[in-house]
């Protein structure tokens, strides 16, 4: 791998970080010079005495980044020990007779070349060992000792035992963590589980109520006047009937039920019906009197009366709308007999009861008075017609 500025900068920063050097403890060679001649040292570090440096880790990092066999040279300058870092080991410095041990003595201007292979040779175990170096001052003047200390097991058997212990501790910690997680989850899930049980019970009760309601669906809604009512044999209602809904504003239809007792506007309608019946009765008597006298009872004589009756009913004589179809007749139970309801009787016309003349129930006590009044009015109308007949004949002549 060719040296470039990016790789040069990365190696310098890694060296300063791993060896924990300050700004003044590392001298860096220019990147352009290193790119032209890779045999120059990339950097020189001034090492302190009695300080542990991770030399094996730094060599492994440089080898992985450069794809070469890096080389570190410890050199005694007389007052301190410098560490020169090379990407490639200089040929003139590398001699086959050199020897690197755990304890090395450096005199003035002497150097010690250390590679990754040398460190692996002095390791007590090939696995689980990290070698570090320490610079110590010797008893002699200007002499330093370089110690390569292997941190780890003493042999392969101890390394395997250490691995078994580490794996056992890891498995125990993992199982304990899983057990604690399950316990915490069970304790924290007690509240939601109780809530789920209550919710399921509530949903079951709601479903039961809905099924009981849907088992027998209610009959389709009908108009209040068409609903069947249980009555006794005498014709009186067995129980109080609920009042019908209020009439819509502007509606010309009025309720014709006989059991509301004027709560929905039937009283005014009953008065209007009485007036219409009286007017029609008077018109019939007048027509009979005119026919007996041999007079013409054409359209001019009965048109004002019909217009008056039509105005009372709220329907124009020139624009008559077809009557709305009545709803289906409902039946009322009268003892053991079934009869149409009061609304149907009012729509379809007067139906004769079991006994007595046809009159509304509320006018049963006023029957004789009404008959007497009608008789008096008929007599008065007849006398008026007889008195006005000579005048009409004189006008004709």
From Swiss-Prot:
Compartments, as annotated in UniProt: Host nucleus inner membrane
UniProt PTM: Phosphorylated. Phosphorylation by viral kinase UL97 at Ser-216 plays an important role for correct viral nuclear egress complex (NEC) localization.
UniProt entry tagged with the keyword Transmembrane: yes
Residue ranges that the UniProt entry lists as topological domain Perinuclear space: 1-358
Membrane topology: Single-pass membrane protein
Top-rank taxon, per record: Viruses
Transmembrane domains' residue ranges: 359-381
Modification sites for Phosphoserine: 216
Comp. bias (Low complexity): 224-239, 291-301
Biased composition (Basic residues): 310-322
One GO cellular component term noted in the UniProt record for this chain: host cell nuclear inner membrane
Keyword terms, alphabetized: Host membrane, Host nucleus, Late protein, Membrane, Phosphoprotein, Transmembrane, Transmembrane helix
Region (Disordered): 205-245, 291-332
InterPro entries: Herpesvirus_viron_egress-type
Pfam families membership: Herpes_U34 (PF04541)
Annotated coiled-coil segments of the chain: none
Nuclear topological intervals: 382-397
Assembly and interaction partners: Forms a heterohexameric complex with NEC1. Interacts with host UBA7 and RNF170; this interaction promotes UBA7 proteasomal degradation.
Homology family: Belongs to the herpesviridae NEC2 protein family.
Free-text function comment from the UniProt entry: Plays an essential role in virion nuclear egress, the first step of virion release from infected cell. Within the host nucleus, NEC1 interacts with the newly formed capsid through the vertexes and directs it to the inner nuclear membrane by associating with NEC2. Induces the budding of the capsid at the inner nuclear membrane as well as its envelopment into the perinuclear space.
Protein name: Nuclear egress protein 2
Provenance organism: Human cytomegalovirus (strain AD169)
